[in-house]
């Protein structure tokens, strides 16, 4: 069994250092065994950066220097961003500057080249990597360019030989984005199954980000607060792991 942490967002949803241990403990409690392999994406950054450079070199991606609002207008108008038409060498030069710190945070992103005329706006030259200078709890300030989840998890799935993906219906666009990325690299995309939004009668709808905000605002005492639907909270309330599995 592989336990994987997709932890490459250092600013918007920065990982909690203690959460790595909590999740491993929760996994062992629920499954009755430790994970055979624990993968932290933050410790595999060279793989993602190498694949990103390969994508640019192959003409399947480019470095975009447009401001977010400016690119949004290009996307809405189904028109190509000027950066898209630059020579590969120019994008590679900017790629080097992104990694060296010469380009500031927000000054550039790497985009996957799809088509700006696609019906679904989310798929039009979607962002794959961006600059983030916030320190990471495990690797600190070692990297300046970090992959977004759709790129990182897609590459990791292929490297790990994943054949089936089970994800929420709200991530259908992730499947569509990653399928386009796999086509660029000549990879076969895994079979994907979906579930609906999870609701527990007592708690209604919930999300990790929503619970995190509520904890920060003092509405809950922590991730093991008995009022939350987390494994740590259920365990604290006296639930047996087998009752959740059954």
Mark where each language-model region is:
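Predominant activation on well-ordered alpha-helical scaffold segments within soluble catalytic domains
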Residues: 24, 175-179, 242-245
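Scaffold signal of the M16-like zinc-metallopeptidase fold and its non-catalytic homologs
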Residues: 211-222, 227
């Amino acid at each position: 069994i592989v336990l994987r942490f997709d932890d490459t967002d250092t600013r918007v949803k920065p990982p909690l250092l203690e959460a790595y241990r909590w999740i491993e403990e929760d996994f062992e409690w629920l499954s009755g065994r430790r994970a055979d392999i624990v993968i932290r994406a933050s410790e595999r950054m060279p793989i993602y950066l190498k694949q990103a450079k390969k994508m640019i070199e192959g003409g399947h991606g480019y470095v975009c220097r447009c401001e977010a609002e400016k690119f949004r207008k290009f996307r809405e108008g189904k028109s190509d961003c000027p950066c898209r038409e630059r020579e590969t060498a120019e994008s590679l030069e900017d790629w080097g500057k992104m990694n060296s710190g010469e380009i500031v945070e927000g000054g550039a992103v790497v985009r996957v080249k799809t088509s700006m005329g696609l019906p679904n706006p989310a798929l039009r030259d979607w962002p794959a990597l961006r600059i983030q200078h916030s320190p990471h709890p495990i690797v600190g300030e070692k990297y300046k360019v970090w992959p977004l989840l759709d790129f990182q998890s897609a590459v990791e799935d292929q490297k790990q030989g994943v054949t089936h993906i089970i994800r929420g219906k709200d991530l259908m666009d992730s499947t569509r984005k990653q399928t386009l990325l796999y086509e660029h690299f000549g990879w076969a995309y895994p079979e994907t199954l979906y579930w609906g939004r999870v609701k527990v009668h007592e708690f209604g709808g919930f999300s990790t980000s929503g619970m995190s905000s509520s904890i920060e605002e003092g509405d809950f005492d922590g991730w093991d607060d008995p009022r939350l639907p987390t494994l740590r909270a259920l365990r604290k309330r006296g639930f047996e792991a087998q009752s959740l599995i059954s």
